[in-house]
């Protein structure tokens, strides 16, 4: 009997009348993937109820192989060491034993000692964590070097003030719990400059270098969006219009959100930036949900905002992206077919119901027009409540592999077939 997989309906793809309750459940014949092998069963520690919210691929022990650091919501963050060929082994208590509401993770050599360090952000308990790596797979808790807490749910790392050191940008939400640090407004973004006099220690520049307003941020991305040589910021929000902050080169940001053509209300959970149209200018992708697993509310259609070449962004989603009604808490940009054009992997969850669906793959034709290539690219077993994704060459074959996070479903590892 031919196996089947879940896919968007032909009707929804065509953009005709859509039924959010049923569109995601049409069945199509499954063909073997020509791009990825789902190696979860043999390469990833089994944890089907874990809330794997994000991951980064980084060599923590200097053996030349990428390891994986995973943020865990309502749990303890995890370190998976790469034992070779992308097989991951769980190293318990690498980041302590305390359970937190961890949302995202990023890595950088913050103290310039040649070893990679790791920062996690937490939402409901409001306490972020910084761990300094020793280059041998061990970490020391240095969270006291972070100058403030918040209810964090967006995280990015990069040199924001031009001094050559990686800084930290944290987007915050407005949840209220007794444990949260209320010394500062809950939902304002945080900007931590790496102290040039003491690399790996941080100075809070939020009050002097950021617009002072309440926000509700679930996603953050850094990129040079106005082509002036410094990193700007895009903030993704589930309740407010998404925002663009432009950098003056010294880490002072001004609101330039009027450059974003936001044509419909969105509940955005993640944002990515890449040159998707091949014109040399960076474009913006917003991954959206209809609601946080409540009733049908906003249109969850993924949105593509195309750079017009001057740092202004037009919404061209209708003519460039497949139409869909599933909700997407996350996705990633990756050239999965090796043609030199960035493609998209798109997480899919049916809401209402919070039903796990198959990961989607959208192929770029090179001009920023995308077609659904799920049946060809994604193995039929790659199903879950897909959350934020890490990527890199785990098995050393020259292809890009992807770890798909899972909220209460098994995180799944896709190994690329590209250069095997």
Q: Which role fits each region the language model picked out?
A:
Residues 1-9:
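Bacterial N-terminal signal peptides
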Residues 15-50, 81-100, 132-150, 188, ...:
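Blade-edge motifs of beta-propeller repeat domains
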Residues 43-71:
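Beta-strand-rich domains and repeat architectures in extracellular enzymes and scaffolds
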Residues 53-62, 103-112, 152-162, 218-227, ...:
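Beta-propeller blade termini
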Residues 74-75, 123-126, 179-187, 237-240, ...:
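Short, solvent-exposed loop/turn segments at conserved positions within beta-propeller repeat blades
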Residues 388-420:
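Blade-level signature of beta-propeller repeat domains, shared across WD40, Kelch, NHL, RCC1
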